């Protein structure tokens, strides 16, 4: 494998006076499944725990996640959602039945964390709830009742039941998932089978009072565009002015790993070849987003329906001596770079892509946080999210290359070594820059045209080794720091990025 590096790893233009689509803050969403130690131990410790908590919810985790201004949180799954019956998780905790988590570790849980606890968590986080309904093993009536229980405010049967359980006012629910991975753990259904079920569940997931649900129809794995087309055919016909109002988004899932599905590679022990295989896989998300978008464009040219990537992130082999069903993995600088190139892809596809959820928030897959008893650490991925918060609800600014960027050959495929995106809001511009080359710095130049800019403030997340990661003994081994040497001369931003680094530069727009 070889690297082709021009004098400038990136030489690009950004027209500040030609903003593009808004980057929905919901592209920075998160995911909490009843899986391993995500909900139990990660979020929920119970009111009797010595770990500081509010109503059983860990205080340190809430405070850390509030730093990210997380816009939405998906729950209770995942595969778990299609075995979850919501009535098991309401009412007095002592009366809730125990259930077996058949998908994840075959462990027994006591339903201590249910609907009321999840909604309390969302209130503490200041985030929008994204609830996944049970299509795989549940009934249409269950879906209808759960939505009524959550969102109806009058004297209806489910509203009365909610009040019996201690909650007078209805909650606001932003997103409701119609199933999860129905082609696999959600029922092993064909696309046409699921489409019929989804139409029923979506019909009875009603809007009550002033609450307006965004219904997300469970979609494809990776680049299964035929699945997306089947779902689009259910709500629109070619040439129709508007899609039918059954669901407002169609989802897909895409995970990044270095090896095969059966042997994905280790989180912190990997070769350079495995590193570059990871980056090639991560960058492929652009092709897949574009493919699903093209299918949707044929049926919905005005982009009234959104595309959702409601599971994404790195998936490695579990850490040694941990339950293989708990999906616990460390989180290295490499993971943060996978996140940053996804963000750039999201920004560039903001017209159609409206929602994304990284898997998962605590102790599972590409986590923001890891916990061990009362201890908690932030991962490099947490820092990548924090550095990118300025893109939430900003207007995207396309980054146009003037010359071809540097590339690295991965088994005959040229993989770009630099990724970039930009946005503007509130009188400022935020430029994101990623150097994927783990062995060489990258000089980048971005010509910011159309508006005057000043006062660059640059932050970088980098490490000497892309396998570097934070531990409970060294929680700040990988942490953001100021990036020196960034200049703006006659509107041209110049910066040198360290190897394997993610940087953001905030600039002030002239009034």
Residue spans of the language-model regions?
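Non-catalytic accessory regions flanking glycosidase/transglycosidase catalytic cores in CAZymes
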Residues: 1-249, 282-286, 290-318, 322-511
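Anion-binding catalytic surfaces of enzymes that hydrolyze or transfer phosphate/sulfate esters
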Residues: 245-247, 251-261
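Active-site His/acidic residue clusters
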Residues: 256-276, 322
């Amino acid at each position: 494998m070889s690297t082709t590096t021009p004098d400038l790893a990136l030489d690009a233009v950004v027209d500040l006076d030609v903003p593009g689509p808004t980057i929905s803050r919901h592209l920075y969403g998160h995911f909490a499944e009843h899986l391993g130690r995500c909900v139990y131990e990660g979020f929920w410790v119970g009111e009797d725990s010595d770990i500081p908590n509010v109503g059983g919810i860990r205080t340190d985790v809430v405070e850390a996640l509030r730093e990210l201004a997380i816009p939405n949180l998906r729950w209770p799954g995942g595969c778990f959602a299609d075995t979850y019956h919501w009535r098991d998780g309401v009412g007095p905790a002592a009366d809730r039945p125990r259930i077996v988590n058949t998908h994840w570790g075959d462990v027994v849980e006591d339903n201590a964390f249910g609907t009321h606890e999840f909604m309390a968590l969302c209130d503490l986080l200041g985030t929008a709830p994204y609830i996944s309904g049970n299509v795989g093993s549940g009934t249409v009536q269950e879906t209808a009742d759960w939505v009524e229980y959550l969102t109806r405010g009058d004297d209806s049967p489910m509203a009365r039941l909610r009040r019996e359980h201690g909650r007078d006012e209805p909650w606001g629910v932003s997103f409701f998932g119609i199933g999860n991975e129905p082609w696999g753990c959600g029922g092993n259904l064909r696309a046409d089978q699921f489409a019929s079920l989804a139409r029923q569940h979506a019909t009875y997931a009603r809007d009550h009072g002033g609450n307006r649900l965004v219904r997300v129809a469970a979609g494809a794995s990776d680049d299964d565009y035929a699945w997306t087309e089947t779902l689009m055919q259910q709500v629109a016909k070619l040439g129709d002015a508007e899609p039918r109002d059954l669901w407002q988004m169609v989802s897909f899932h895409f995970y990044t790993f270095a090896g095969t599905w059966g042997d994905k590679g280790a989180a912190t022990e990997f070769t350079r070849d495995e590193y570059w295989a990871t980056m090639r896989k991560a960058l492929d998300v652009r092709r897949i987003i574009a493919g699903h978008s093209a299918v949707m464009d044929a049926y919905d040219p005005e982009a009234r329906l959104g595309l959702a990537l409601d599971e994404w992130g790195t998936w490695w082999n579990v850490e040694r001596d941990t339950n293989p069903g708990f999906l616990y993995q460390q989180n290295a600088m490499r993971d943060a770079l996978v996140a940053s190139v996804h963000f750039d892809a999201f920004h560039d596809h903001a017209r159609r892509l409206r929602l994304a959820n990284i898997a998962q928030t605590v102790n599972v897959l590409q986590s923001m946080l890891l916990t061990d008893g009362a201890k908690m650490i932030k991962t490099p991925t947490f820092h990548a999210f924090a550095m990118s918060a300025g893109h939430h609800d900003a207007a995207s600014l396309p980054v146009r290359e003037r010359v071809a960027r540097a590339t690295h050959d991965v088994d005959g495929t040229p993989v770009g070594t630099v990724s970039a995106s930009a946005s503007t809001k509130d009188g400022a511009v935020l430029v994101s820059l990623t150097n994927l080359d783990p062995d060489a710095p990258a000089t980048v130049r971005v010509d910011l045209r159309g508006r005057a800019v000043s006062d660059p403030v640059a932050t970088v997340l980098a490490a000497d080794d892309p396998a570097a990661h934070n531990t409970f003994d060294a929680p700040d081994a990988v942490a953001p720091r100021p990036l020196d040497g960034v200049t703006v001369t006659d509107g041209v931003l110049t910066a040198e990025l360290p190897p394997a680094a993610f940087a953001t530069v905030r600039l002030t727009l002239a009034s």
